[in-house]
């Protein structure tokens, strides 16, 4: 009953946000609202089903979740019910699970190594494995069991539907591989890849599996020389994964977050940075380090020679085009891409070893995730930056002045879903002088193209059902000056969803009609934490909240990595790769410049005092900011 009420309230908020006049909705709008409610109800039923099953002490067979997956009709899995493989969904899943999943039949979930050990699993002694496109700590026992560390409920909302989707597609392939006995025999022939016969067999197998040449090539990129052996593993066994949750509690998630924070707090103390102003950035661990340290730029000649050797044909071609002016890309971005690839070669090992030392000399310290959450972090001491080493695009007049007392950046690899709330809350609990919170992450765009950059000033959080209205500190001009391939979409509305597979077409259509065009997973949880940093109560549920004025800077940037309205163009079908660096770095540069300009000017000191005073006045008044429903005049967004 409560879930239905929350769903209706959410639908009403979506209608109000779209500007629909109360009591005057047309018949088709009513039908759309009902369709949205039905889509939401099926998603909620799916979530409740697996959450209920995971509360038990035993193992859960995922076969029992297949029908709920079908009913939810995930937009990421449009042909789940079809007999032919959904290659987009299949590729999405294998990119987000370790390759050891092909050898596994059981998956264990736990919050800490102590929890695993208490249940008889010494996972730290197992083989550490990783997925290509999802950061998570995985361990494989070498037989048939995978273990994953979970940081929040968002991890279960991610892992469970992904495993169910893989099982559905696995069993389609299993049936097709065994429909004709000669298919498995062909794969068992072990023909050399260089042989002409290999290409002929591949063509026959590909056509029998209904896989396009383009998708087959993607499988070759993911599995390399193991495409045939991977298909053999699928063909030999019909899959019914079992899943077991070991313990799992709210306190456990809090404990994991504090264990994650421990090494960061220790380094803060060792570097004596505790009394300095702090800027929190959620992005990745390569962007700011590259922009601030200059390690790649100082090796320009070395990296250029590496690119032109042809070890990577793409780098070779792109380097030549950039050199002769026939490619529109940015040379600095190219160097960062080349440096990443160079570090992976034997010739680049000297660079890989010296890089951390050079970065630390320039104030960039790396804190790898060893305990708790699998979220790497960086501490960047702005007082140690060397202006001549900065990327030219972030250089700011005045950086050569005395730097004593300058701020510190805490930069983290962006977390998944509700882990964002726990991370930012931990930071805000432990550091008093936070001057800015800047969030950069991937998102689905409903009205743009892959590589576009979106700036939102409204965020609807599906977790808390809160709608946040904020004054985003970034504008289109901050991004567009360094964006080559994409476009900047300003004044967007974002919705933070529960998971990639927990969205369906009715869900997305309803939000799109209500002008919500950015779909992601972290902004809402981050804003829930911001709420708790300025009020004496926990974040509410189902409220409209005005963040137009805050005691610190707030910026929100997303770059489009997914377009669900173009079938097959999700992250499973193609990744941002080199071209995605364009939007990522344009956004990172905007964040870096924003921070450096504040440090140099010092002009925001008075503004911060004014905002703090305004906040104090509001607290002494209503106690609930923005309790009324925003109207059509875009309240909640302060004029610049």
Task: List each model region and its residues.
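Accessory terminal and edge-of-domain segments that mediate assembly/interaction
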Residues: 2-626, 630-631, 635-640
């Amino acid at each position: 009953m409560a879930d239905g009420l929350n769903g209706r309230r959410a639908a009403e908020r979506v209608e109000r946000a779209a500007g629909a006049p109360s009591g005057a909705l047309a018949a088709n709008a009513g039908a759309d609202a009902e369709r949205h409610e039905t889509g939401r109800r099926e998603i909620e039923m799916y979530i409740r089903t697996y959450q209920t099953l995971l509360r038990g002490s035993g193992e859960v067979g995922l076969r029992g979740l297949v029908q709920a997956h079908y009913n939810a009709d995930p937009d990421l899995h449009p042909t789940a019910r079809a007999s032919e493989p959904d290659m987009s969904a299949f590729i999405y899943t294998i990119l987000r699970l370790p390759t050891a999943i092909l050898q596994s039949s059981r998956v264990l979930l736990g919050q800490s190594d102590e929890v695993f050990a208490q249940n008889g699993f010494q996972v730290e002694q197992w083989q550490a494995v990783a997925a290509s496109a999802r950061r998570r700590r995985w361990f494989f026992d070498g037989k048939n069991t995978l273990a994953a560390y979970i940081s929040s409920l968002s991890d279960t909302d991610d892992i469970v539907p992904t495993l169910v989707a893989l099982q559905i597609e696995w069993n389609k392939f299993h049936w097709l591989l065994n429909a004709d006995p000669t298919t498995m025999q062909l794969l068992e022939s072990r023909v050399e890849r260089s042989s002409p016969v290999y290409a002929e067999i591949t063509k026959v197998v590909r056509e029998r599996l209904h896989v396009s040449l383009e998708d087959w090539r993607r499988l070759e990129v993911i599995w390399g020389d193991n495409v045939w052996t991977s298909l053999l593993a699928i063909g030999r066994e019909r899959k019914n994964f079992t899943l077991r949750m070991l313990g799992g509690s709210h306190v456990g998630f809090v404990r994991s977050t504090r264990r994650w924070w421990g090494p960061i707090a220790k380094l803060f103390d060792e570097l004596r940075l505790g009394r300095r102003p702090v800027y929190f950035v959620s992005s990745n661990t390569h962007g700011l380090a590259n922009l601030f340290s200059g390690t790649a730029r100082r090796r320009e000649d070395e990296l250029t020679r590496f690119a032109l050797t042809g070890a990577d044909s793409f780098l070779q071609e792109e380097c030549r085009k950039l050199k002769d002016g026939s490619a529109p890309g940015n040379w600095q971005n190219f160097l960062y891409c080349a440096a990443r690839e160079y570090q992976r070669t034997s010739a680049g090992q000297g660079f890989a070893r010296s890089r951390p030392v050079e970065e630390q000399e320039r104030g960039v310290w790396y804190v790898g995730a060893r305990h708790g959450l699998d979220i790497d972090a960086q501490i960047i001491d702005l007082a140690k930056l060397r202006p001549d080493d900065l990327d030219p695009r972030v250089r700011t007049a005045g950086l050569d002045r005395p730097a004593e007392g300058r701020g510190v950046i805490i930069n983290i690899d962006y977390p998944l879903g509700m882990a964002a709330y726990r991370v930012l809350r931990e930071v805000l609990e432990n550091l008093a002088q936070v001057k800015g919170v800047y969030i950069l992450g991937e998102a689905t765009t409903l009205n743009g193209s892959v590589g576009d950059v979106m700036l939102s000033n409204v965020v609807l959080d599906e977790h808390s059902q809160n709608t946040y209205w904020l004054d985003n500190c970034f504008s289109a001009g901050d991004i567009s000056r360094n964006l080559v391939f994409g476009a900047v979409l300003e004044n967007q509305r974002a919705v933070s969803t529960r998971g990639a597979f927990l969205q369906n077409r009715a869900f997305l259509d309803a939000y799109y009609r209500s002008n919500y065009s950015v779909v992601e997973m972290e902004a809402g949880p981050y804003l829930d934490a911001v709420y708790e940093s300025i009020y004496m109560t926990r974040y509410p549920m189902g409220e409209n909240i005005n963040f137009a004025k805050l005691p610190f800077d707030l910026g929100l940037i997303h770059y489009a990595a997914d377009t669900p309205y173009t079938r097959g163009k999700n992250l499973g079908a193609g990744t941002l790769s080199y071209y995605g660096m364009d939007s990522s770095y344009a956004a990172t540069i905007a964040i870096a410049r924003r921070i450096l300009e504040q440090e140099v000017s010092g002009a925001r000191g008075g503004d911060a005092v004014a905002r703090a005073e305004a906040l104090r006045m509001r607290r002494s008044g209503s106690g609930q900011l923005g309790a009324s429903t925003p109207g059509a005049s875009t309240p909640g967004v302060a004029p610049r």
